[in-house]
Amino acid sequence: MPDLSAPLLAPHGVAALPDKRQVAASFSRAAASYDAVAELQRGVGESLLAALPEGFAPRRWVDLGCGTGYFSRALAQRFGGGEGLAVDIAEGMLRHARARGGASHFIGGDAERLPLRDGSCDLLFSSLAIQWCADLPAVLAEARRVLRPGGVLAFSSLCVGTLGELRDSWRVVDGFVHVNRFRAFADYLQHAAGSGLLPLVLRHEDRVLHFPDLRSLTHELKALGAHNLNPGRPDGLTGRQRIRALVAAYERFRQPGGLPATYRVVFGVLRKDS
């Protein structure tokens, strides 16, 4: 890992909580397969790039939760004159991203405790990552801390309503938690209002993918590393009878294009006062 000990790195390290280690391990395992099935992630990230303020030209940008580095490379192309940092909690993703380039440095780090100096960057870009953070106020406080005056936090995330079809179908089968939980959009509004950052954009929209069958959907979730990571999930394999019941329940949602999977995506662009 590059030595960034000069004015960039903060004096503290990163202390990942146990649940974060589980998330990191899951995404590390998915690194090799991620890009092949990341249609939603690419589309959402492109929309987030388009939401950046017109004429904005950061001298130093951070791709927070960089994953395979797809948007690190996009940011490097867009802001060629700036320095780029790619940050992720999953070492497997960082290894994959580092091999493909794009950023000047690749750093293991946690969005709730960024390994960056105060006032050290102009843009924090984070697409579909902070939904895995338990402490959203800490994420926003860290963004405010590390941004320079006039700097921007641009993020996309997921909120309640995501994978509702799958959640409702599992409810027909049993009482276990089978689908990742996400915070309500009202929480984003509340915490952004108290963050000390000025919201330029804060909205949500539904994006719907279609799959020929349930197996295709669950395969994609696993390939993305985004399968069920919640406490309360069932241990061990799911029996054939329950799977058949799940398939039957999900078929109620079938549309002409296939089985829908709805992602309720939050877009936020927040600026630090100059």
UniProtKB/Swiss-Prot annotation:
Pfam families (alphabetical): Methyltransf_11
Any one Gene Ontology molecular-function term assigned to this protein's record: carboxyl-O-methyltransferase activity
Known catalytic reactions: malonyl-[ACP] + S-adenosyl-L-methionine = malonyl-[ACP] methyl ester + S-adenosyl-L-homocysteine
Q: Give the Enzyme Commission number.
A: 2.1.1.197
Q: Per UniProt, which keywords does this protein have? A: Biotin biosynthesis, Methyltransferase, S-adenosyl-L-methionine, Transferase
Q: In which pathway does it act?
A: Cofactor biosynthesis; biotin biosynthesis
Instruction: Please give the biological process terms from Gene Ontology that the record holds.
Output: biotin biosynthetic process; methylation
| Signal peptide start-end | none
Its top-level enzyme class, in one word, is transferase
| Record flagged with keyword Oxidoreductase | no
Q: What does this protein do?
A: Converts the free carboxyl group of a malonyl-thioester to its methyl ester by transfer of a methyl group from S-adenosyl-L-methionine (SAM). It allows to synthesize pimeloyl-ACP via the fatty acid synthetic pathway.
Enumerate the HAMAP family for this protein.
BioC (MF_00835)
| Family (UniProt) | Belongs to the methyltransferase superfamily.
NCBIfam families according to UniProt: BioC
Protein name from the UniProt record: Malonyl-[acyl-carrier protein] O-methyltransferase
What species was this sequence derived from? Answer: Pseudomonas paraeruginosa (strain DSM 24068 / PA7)
- UniProt lists the gene as bioC
